[in-house]
From Swiss-Prot:
Positions that bind Mg(2+): 19
A GO CC term attached to the entry: cytosol
Gene this chain is encoded by: metK
Record-given protein name: S-adenosylmethionine synthase
Pathway as given in its UniProt record: Amino-acid biosynthesis; S-adenosyl-L-methionine biosynthesis; S-adenosyl-L-methionine from L-methionine: step 1/1
Source organism (scientific name): Bacillus cereus (strain ATCC 14579 / DSM 31 / CCUG 7414 / JCM 2152 / NBRC 15305 / NCIMB 9373 / NCTC 2599 / NRRL B-3711)
Length: 399
């Protein structure tokens, strides 16, 4: 039988990408507030352009944080430290425009919220409604050890490595902005078999040659990350394919919070409900329910109930219970999807306050998620990446 060729591509970006700068600023502000006021309501949006940062949104809190200071520290940590980059931590202007959360929204969410989740009764959890309507997806598959699709997993690792060799001066001519993209070939059974194409674009010092960049990235980035057995003589490499990438960061492109939602999740391999994560506290189901859906999907796959699983949750504003829960195993399930939905209902509390309690989401843990993906992370300890429900799911499924 002739082998059917099936390619799938995902991309990632470095922490110096303009949109990712914004995500990190928004989540740094969120973390700073949560560290002092765990019950704060935060929706923080950031935009950056040449020499300017604008922070806007709705924040309701009993504490004070120095937003311009947080902004500058975040930019400094990313590596925009020189004015000749067109954007730097010391000289950029920082404007803020912050309101309180709308009373109309708060009305549907606030009941019993002053109670700590750990001490809340079921009635109190039921009284806390979702902060908005919407649909959220979570996904897991057995392509990698972290139960993520291989293309996005490799793209994130390349982007992280690009930053590492810049910051440790292995390749001191690199600058903060950069993107990676990986195309993986799948066989007729849907299994990843090889890397077909790797694309890396990285900002750099004007005096370095393309030949140096091409050689160094293959040696210090690609070889360090991509397993040799996945590459062959047919694997294609496109390193800075325009030939030059000196002007970058916010000087090259304006950035906005929430513009890299596919990078943040599954690289396009699974569906997406459209809601962004960064800058939002856990009462926003855009964030917390997407984390919960990943937690559910990962435990289904870890339990061996399916090779891949996509979980959809949906909510109505002011209503605690999800209006729908669905599971799609793409024909790989060991039990029916109806059984899986029932297992999910019995083992996971998917009401907003239940999710916050289950995943302990009132902590200042979010900046670390704002670059290199929110899922499949092995470098940080994230509660939604645990597989502590897998054994119970397997037992209850009778496997």
């Amino acid at each position: 039988m002739t082998k059917k060729r099936h390619l799938f591509t995902s991309e990632s970006v470095t922490e110096g990408h303009p949109d990712k700068i914004c995500d990190q600023i928004s989540d740094s502000i969120l973390d700073a507030i949560l560290s002092k006021d765990a019950n704060a309501r935060v929706a923080c949006e950031t935009t950056v352009t040449t020499g300017l940062v604008l922070v806007a949104g709705e924040i309701t809190t009993s504490t004070y944080v120095d937003i311009p200071k947080i902004v500058r520290e975040t930019i400094q940590g990313i590596g925009y430290t020189r004015a000749k980059y067109g954007f730097d931590a010391e000289t950029c202007a920082v404007l803020t425009s912050i309101d309180e959360q709308s009373a109309d929204i708060a009305m549907g969410v606030d009941q019993a919220l002053e109670a700590r989740e750990g001490q809340m009764t079921d009635a109190e959890i039921e009284a806390i409604g979702a902060g908005d309507q919407g649909l959220m997806f979570g996904f897991a598959c057995n392509e990698t050890q972290e139960l993520m699709p291989l293309p996005i997993s490799l793209a994130h690792k390349l982007a992280r490595r690009l930053t590492e060799v810049r910051k440790d001066d292995t390749l001191s001519y690199l600058r903060p902005d950069g993107k990676t993209q990986v195309t993986v070939e799948y066989d007729e059974n849907g299994k990843p078999v090889r890397v077909d194409t790797i694309v890396i674009s990285t900002q750099h010092h004007p005096d370095v040659t393309w030949e140096e960049i091409d050689r160094d990235l293959k040696e210090h980035v690609i070889k360090a990350v991509v397993p040799a057995e996945l590459m062959d003589g047919e694997t294609k490499f496109f390193i800075n394919p325009t030939g030059r990438f000196v002007i970058g960061g916010p000087q090259g492109d304006a950035g906005l919070t929430g513009r890299k939602i596919i990078v943040d999740t599954y690289g396009g391999y699974a569906r997406h409900g459209g809601g962004a994560f960064s800058g939002k506290d856990a009462t926003k189901v855009d964030r917390s329910a997407a984390y919960a859906a990943r937690y559910v999907a990962k435990n289904i796959v870890a339990a061996g109930l399916a090779e891949k699983a996509e979980v959809q949750l949906a909510y109505a504003i002011g209503v605690a219970q999800p209006v729908s829960i669905s599971v799609d195993t793409f024909g790989t399930g060991k039990v029916s999807e109806d059984v899986l939905v029932e297992l999910v209902r019995n083992n996971f509390d998917l009401r907003p306050a239940g999710i916050i309690k289950m995943l302990d989401l009132r902590r200042p843990i979010y900046k670390q998620t704002a670059a290199y993906g929110h899922f499949g992370r092995t470098d940080v300890d994230l509660s939604w990446e645990r597989t502590d429900k897998a054994a119970a799911l397997k037992e209850q499924a009778g496997l």
